[in-house]
Amino acid sequence: MGSTSSLYAAIDLGSNSFHMLVVREVAGSIQTLTRIKRKVRLAAGLNSENALSNEAMERGWQCLRLFAERLQDIPPSQIRVVATATLRLAVNAGDFIAKAQEILGCPVQVISGEEEARLIYQGVAHTTGGADQRLVVDIGGASTELVTGTGAQTTSLFSLSMGCVTWLERYFADRNLGQENFDAAEKAAREVLRPIADELRYHGWKVCVGASGTVQALQEIMMAQGMDERITLEKLQQLKQRAIHCGRLEELEIDGLTLERALVFPSGLAILIAIFTELNIQYMTLAGGALREGLVYGMLHLAVEQDIRSRTLRNIQRRFMIDIDQAQRVAKVAANFFDQVENEWHLEAISRDLLISACQLHEIGLSVDFKQAPQHAAYLVRNLDLPGFTPAQKKLLATLLLNQTNPVDLSSLHQQNAVPPRVAEQLCRLLRLAIIFASRRRDDLVPEMTLQANHELLTLTLPQGWLTQHPLGKEIIAQESQWQSYVHWPLEVH
């Protein structure tokens, strides 16, 4: 029993898909062991009287038989099963739930829309970095949740009766992706949103986060097409035109859109366009977690950390036995350099955060081997679960670590899409210099330096006589100047 007592499971009986998440608690964080998702499309089985068809119920039970096998090893007190919009609506939900409980061997709780919204917000708060004041949007199969909050506290909660399955059946039933179907779907969604828009705007938000399959699909499309990961209304309109151009649902082909997600993509897209338009959202990013993560963190009674990225970095430093003092030393030098050039280079605060994060992890590759340590570091960061960092930010961190020393691979810095290529180059230069000047691993041996930027030219001024007194340091800096010059990064050292 010992090895299973730290296991927790969360099951979400959604209107479109059933999901199961099994995690292990590790040092105040969660490690994902199993994720199973099955498209059950329960909402599609509701008739005009809101009765679930036998076929839809059977699809659901069949899926739960798969889940049940995995649950046998987990203490019942560490399992939570919740049902959402379709089972709130269905007049015969009791029949479905009775058999579901028999199959799973644990209670199934039908939660209210507000409770669902609260749990979604908790999942986002525990797993997603960025500004504290946020608007969270989750487009489900039969309901859409919108929540505002600050830190761990929600300020407004709404659950609306519209979702990608119900909108598919209502506005795209003929499988025609014409402008008129999109117009009707968007108009209806805006009418549902209008009564709550004022209250959401009143509470306000600094960042908007999407936590659903529709937003996940958009992220996958944008990554596949090499766009940056911010979802904007302009990009949504472009994708709508692409869908209209395809003509019919069965012919919908967009780079990066999986077959599994394609069916409910147009209806989800129409709802999202309505949300962007009605609430005047500038951009949206993808959440790190939602309902299932909210359930798991709720069972663990873990406090929401103010800075999720810091928690992630601390956990990884411990796990890979990174020298934390040295990581801090490099970060301090890099921050000092950044602060001296940020105005000339027009750098944003998020770039500083990402540079410091790269410093905190720059020696992770040594846990594999000194030889090829930068390549090992890049591989680890690309493949580790990093709550608080978006997929594009992970890719940038990996790319910076790959280029922390040795000749620069410029193309890799241009292939990430978290920041513009020029910014990635600038962060890389600062990281490399910080690593060099902190390499003696003692605070008192880091020289006082000034760094000036004039367009792309960096001028580094060292204390009088420093280069003469440090022949190895002088050689390393000369080599670095040469490597930077190969990629047209002029560096002068005095």
UniProtKB/Swiss-Prot annotation:
Domain of life from the UniProt record: Bacteria
Involved pathway(s): Purine metabolism; ppGpp biosynthesis; ppGpp from GTP: step 2/2
Reactions listed under catalytic activity: guanosine 3'-diphosphate 5'-triphosphate + H2O = guanosine 3',5'-bis(diphosphate) + phosphate + H(+)
Primary enzyme class: hydrolase
The protein's Enzyme Commission number: 3.6.1.40
Keyword Hydrolase attributed: yes
Record InterPro entries: ATPase_NBD (IPR043129), GppA/Ppx_hydrolase (IPR050273), Guo-5TP_3DP_PyrP (IPR023709), Ppx_GppA_C (IPR048950), Ppx_GppA_N (IPR003695), PyroPPase_GppA_Ppx (IPR030673)
One function term, GO molecular function aspect: guanosine-5'-triphosphate,3'-diphosphate diphosphatase activity
Keywords: Hydrolase
GO BP, sorted A to Z: guanosine pentaphosphate catabolic process; guanosine tetraphosphate biosynthetic process; nucleobase-containing small molecule interconversion
Protein family membership: Belongs to the GppA/Ppx family. GppA subfamily.
Its job: Catalyzes the conversion of pppGpp to ppGpp. Guanosine pentaphosphate (pppGpp) is a cytoplasmic signaling molecule which together with ppGpp controls the 'stringent response', an adaptive process that allows bacteria to respond to amino acid starvation, resulting in the coordinated regulation of numerous cellular activities.
Protein name in UniProt: Guanosine-5'-triphosphate,3'-diphosphate pyrophosphatase
Organism: Shigella dysenteriae serotype 1 (strain Sd197)
